[in-house]
Amino acid sequence: MKWSEVFHDITTRHDFQAMHDFLEKEYTTQTVYPDKQNIYQAFDLTPFEDIKVVILGQDPYHGPNQAHGLAFSVQPHAKFPPSLRNMYQELENDIGCHRTSPHLQDWAREGVLLLNTVLTVRQGEAHSHRNIGWETFTDEIIQAVSNYREHVVFILWGRPAQQKERFIDTSKHLIIKSPHPSPLSAFRGFFGSKPYSTTNNYLKSKGKTPVQWCES
């Protein structure tokens, strides 16, 4: 199974023409993130057959020079978002590695699908592209990973991500849940949750190569 087959299956069962038309107008008349060529970058960098981990985000960062198609990641010279800074703090506390770049392309190439549930946003307007069709698309993506892959770790931070648990077969995958790493909730159970070591211990127990979370 490849992404092209997954996408074909989804688009034969759902009509995304209205969303496509809306986005064409938005990209023509508004500033929208990420750049159009980066909307599907998570799928470009993480082949379906290589997925080991899915980290779910919500919608892209809505400031300039941030979003580039990977959940939680920002472009290499962008300012660190607070949630990502907290993710890195937990990474250092969990497995002792220190990351300096806010760009998570290396994680994506390691088999970590960094998936937002909504893939576009208008500049300065969080959640502005909710309910245009993206949720249907990404719910189907989660379902496809659950159905056609084995022993994937799904990392669900915060309540919106955890609502997607219903699409995941827990008999053959691991779900890691905690509060979101945002400053509003990180101290309510995200810190100390050890998602990175838990993920790698599970992957090793299933005979898979662990994720290299540290910068190489």
UniProtKB/Swiss-Prot annotation:
- Show which residues constitute the signal peptide: none
* Gene behind this protein: ung
Q: Where is the active site?
A: 59
Q: What is the lineage of its organism?
A: Bacteria, Bacillati, Bacillota, Bacilli, Bacillales
> Any idea where this protein resides?
Cytoplasm
Its Enzyme Commission number(s) read 3.2.2.27
Please give the coiled-coil regions recorded for this protein.
none
Query: Which keywords has UniProt assigned to this entry?
Result: Cytoplasm, DNA damage, DNA repair, Hydrolase
One GO biological process this protein is involved in is: base-excision repair, AP site formation via deaminated base removal
Give me the reactions it catalyses: Hydrolyzes single-stranded DNA or mismatched double-stranded DNA and polynucleotides, releasing free uracil
Q: Which family does it belong to?
A: Belongs to the uracil-DNA glycosylase (UDG) superfamily. UNG family.
Protein name according to UniProt? Uracil-DNA glycosylase
Protein origin, superkingdom: Bacteria
Which NCBIfam families does the record cross-reference, listed alphabetically? PRK05254.1-1, PRK05254.1-2, PRK05254.1-4, PRK05254.1-5, ung
